[in-house]
Amino acid sequence: MPAAAPDIRVRRIYEPPSPDDGVRVLVDRLWPRGLARTDARIDEWPKALTPSTQLRRWYHGPDGAYEEFCRRYEDELSAPAAAEALDRLRGLAAQGTVTLLTAAKDPSAGHTSVLVRALSETQA
């Protein structure tokens, strides 16, 4: 019988924590503006899984294209530190709900969609 798909959710960090969140993981490189660390209630902040500063600046610059951003971010996720952090989150997701938290206005777009896809893939 195939394993159940992991329960990976994406929410804005500015939303109040929910009892259904499970493990709360901040997936932004920078701390969210205007949010006290005590209010965030995060369990993990794996900066190795966040887009690099260079990639983030490129994407928000005049030449940034979403498809190319996704490709470059996927490349970054194959780095050893990122791969180790992905494996850790996959393990947590196998045990229960993992909620990825971002300050982005549209939490289902941007790097979180790439990260959800990477976390949902089984390791070969």
Name the predicted role of every residue range.
Residues M1-A124:
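Residues lining hydrophobic/aromatic ligand-binding pockets adjacent to catalytic sites
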